[in-house]
């Protein structure tokens, strides 16, 4: 089963997202990526925060798991920025790496006001966007479980 680690980084009533433009589609995703062999989901989340956002983070808590069909599980962590500069990602999608293809689209790190999350139908996973809205109002509870087909 493929495991993906994602982060929820909130500052000043805004959440960090990656704005994507790919194959004529415009959408937003929570930062994250695949867990490499020998790596824990927590380690992957920390690595992905640096690669995609340019920030160092500390894990606060696991907030959600999303089962995607039979082949993938996404784990999301609430994180706190401890260093780095937002928008200075070092991942291959931001550099002239030979292994990155422009066909993979454009990645732009952004801060989206949390009150705007509810008005965007193109934030993925939508369950995590709804969880952020609810949890900012009511507080973070135990791990939420979601399933996507």
List where the protein language model places each region.
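Conserved N-terminal beta-strand and adjoining loop/helix that marks the start
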Residues: 1-16, 37
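A conserved catalytic-core signature of glycosyltransferases
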Residues: 4-5, 25, 72, 107
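Conserved hydrophobic "DFG−1" position in protein kinase catalytic cores
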Residues: 9-10, 17, 79, 111
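Short strand-connecting beta-turns/loops that link adjacent beta-strands
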Residues: 12-14, 22-24, 71
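A short linear hydrophobic-aromatic micro-motif
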Residues: 17, 60-63
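A short gly/proline-enriched turn/hairpin at secondary-structure junctions
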Residues: 29-30
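Unchanged
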Residues: 35-58, 66-124, 148-149
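Charged phosphate-binding loop/patch that engages nucleotide di/tri-phosphates or the phosphate backbone
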Residues: 123-149
């Amino acid at each position: 089963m493929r495991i993906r680690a994602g982060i929820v980084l909130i500052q000043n009533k805004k959440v960090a997202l990656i704005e994507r433009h790919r194959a004529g589609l415009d959408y937003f995703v929570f930062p994250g990526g695949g867990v490499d062999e020998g790596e824990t989901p927590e380690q992957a989340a920390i690595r992905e925060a640096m690669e995609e956002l340019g920030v160092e983070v500390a894990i606060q808590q696991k907030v959600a798991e999303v089962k995607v069909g039979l082949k993938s599980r996404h784990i999301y962590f609430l994180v706190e920025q401890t260093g780095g500069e937002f928008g200075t990602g070092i991942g291959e999608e931001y550099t002239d790496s030979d292994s990155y293809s422009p066909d993979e689209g454009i990645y732009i790190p952004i801060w989206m006001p949390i009150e705007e999350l509810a008005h965007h139908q193109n934030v993925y996973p939508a369950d995590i966007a709804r969880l952020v809205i609810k949890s900012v109002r009511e507080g973070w509870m135990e791990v939420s479980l979601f399933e996507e087909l």
